[in-house]
């Protein structure tokens, strides 16, 4: 493994990554684990006890929680999310006609399947030029605000017709809370963290 570790450390250094805690595991063992510390960042806290933001790695967790909850509550995967979150029915579809952004009504109910598969019509501002333009014009709140305001961004296509990386998992989080009556973090602990003994894993409050 020495040559492999040397290779990945060289790669991390070329990419100017400050710190990496890495490992290779199977279902029952750890075959490799290591730490990469970039000497260009000597003041950065670099230890295995620090917490990391998981960013979009929270999506698989949210997907698992969604499927577990749908199973517990006997909710069909293709049922409309609007049954539990009426506000999602208010999202319109944005499109461009020349240089003008226009809107039309969405007549296709957004299902749990649409949200899970990123085919709901939701898009991130850094993935879709139309949403990016709306953010730049201050017609849509930017994601960096860190609140739910960006969920009000319009759809960019009819649900089920295309694929786009976007805020559909934000809507799933809200649906999980609406169905269960408890927070997303409480659901995470109930279905995943407690059964697996994960004591330092949580969603941000």
Listing of model-derived features with the role each one plays in the protein:
Residues 2-53, 74-76, 90-97:
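Short, conserved catalytic-motif segment at the N-terminal edge
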Residues 29, 123-127, 200:
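Proline-centered turn/helix-capping motifs that create local helix->coil transitions or kinks
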Residues 33-35, 126-130, 204:
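Short, solvent-exposed loop/turn and secondary-structure capping segments
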Residues 46-49, 99-100, 153-159, 168-170:
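Flexible glycine/proline-enriched surface loops and loop-helix/loop-strand junctions
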Residues 48, 71-122, 152, 179-205:
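Active-site helix/loop module of the DD-peptidase/beta-lactamase fold
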Residues 5-8, 28, 53-81, 172-177:
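Active-site SXXK
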């Amino acid at each position: 493994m020495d040559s492999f570790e040397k290779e990945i450390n060289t790669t991390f250094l070329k990419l100017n990554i400050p710190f990496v805690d890495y490992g290779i595991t199977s279902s029952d063992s750890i075959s490799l684990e290591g730490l990469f510390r970039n000497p260009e960042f000597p003041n950065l806290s670099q230890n295995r006890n620090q917490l990391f933001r998981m960013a979009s790695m929270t999506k698989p967790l949210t997907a698992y929680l969604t499927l577990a909850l749908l199973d517990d509550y006997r909710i069909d995967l293709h049922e409309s999310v609007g049954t539990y979150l009426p506000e999602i029915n208010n999202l319109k579809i944005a499109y461009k006609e020349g240089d003008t952004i226009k809107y039309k009504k969405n007549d296709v109910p957004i299902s749990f399947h649409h949200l899970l598969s990123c085919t709901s019509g939701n898009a991130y501002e850094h993935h879709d030029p139309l949403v990016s333009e709306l953010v730049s014009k201050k017609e849509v709140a930017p994601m960096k605000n860190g609140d739910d305001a960006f969920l009000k961004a319009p759809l960019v296509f009819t649900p089920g017709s295309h694929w786009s990386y976007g805020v559909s998992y934000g809507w799933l989080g809200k649906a999980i809370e609406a169905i269960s009556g408890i927070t997303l973090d409480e659901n995470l602990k109930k279905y995943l963290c407690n059964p697996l003994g994960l004591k330092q894993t949580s969603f941000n409050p």
